[in-house]
């Protein structure tokens, strides 16, 4: 942690996450609690934790996660995880809100029709849908014009009907992989990272 802080040339970070729910999660969490207590981290959180893993983490530690960064997009809406997080004071944050364009997201007729109705892009419709669900979104872009477009979602509101149409797109399936698949867990935990 100190090496990362030095490379960033900072005295503290605003948010620090455990990226996957594997390994010595409780040991890592307690170390993060100590860093938060020391003022090196303002908020601590997790990524890719299902409610059962969060319940375990909360039960055996002093500080509950401030954030849980999970895959949320129109095809994987996390209809159980999002309200569970919110009811426990954990802010859901959507990674891959556009599912990296998989499943034809940017051409989907429901999303394009809603976008046309408001004069907005599919990306803006998706980000607004996430916003209206009380979820923070983490939308990656390297293009300046796309970044500006992604910010411009506060001048319209999706109707209840729009929200229901998007809700109907849910397949409850990751566009990437299952964090509960034993083969994937073995692969992830077997990787050696040079940090």
Question: Model-flagged regions — what are they?
Answer:
Residues 1-17, 34-38:
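CE4/NodB-like, metal-dependent polysaccharide N-deacetylase domain
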Residues 20-195:
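Beta/alpha (TIM)-barrel catalytic core signal, keyed to glycine-rich beta->alpha loops juxtaposed to Asp/Glu
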């Amino acid at each position: 942690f100190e090496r990362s802080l030095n490379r960033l040339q900072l005295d503290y970070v605003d948010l620090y996450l455990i990226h996957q729910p594997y390994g010595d999660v409780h040991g890592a969490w307690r170390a993060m609690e100590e860093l938060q207590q020391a003022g090196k981290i303002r908020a601590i959180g997790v990524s890719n934790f299902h409610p059962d893993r969060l319940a375990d983490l909360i039960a055996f530690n002093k500080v509950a996660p401030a954030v849980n960064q999970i895959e949320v997009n129109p095809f994987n809406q996390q209809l159980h995880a999002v309200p569970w997080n919110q009811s426990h004071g954990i802010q859901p944050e959507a990674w891959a809100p556009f599912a990296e364009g998989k499943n034809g997201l940017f051409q989907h007729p429901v999303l394009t029709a809603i976008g046309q109705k408001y004069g907005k892009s599919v990306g803006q419709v998706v980000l607004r849908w996430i916003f209206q669900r009380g979820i923070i979104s983490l939308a990656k872009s390297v293009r300046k014009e796309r970044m500006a477009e992604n910010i411009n979602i506060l001048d319209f509101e999706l109707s209840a009907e729009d929200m229901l149409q998007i809700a109907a797109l849910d397949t409850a399936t990751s566009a990437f992989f299952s964090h509960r698949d034993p083969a994937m867990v073995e692969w992830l935990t077997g990787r050696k990272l040079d940090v």
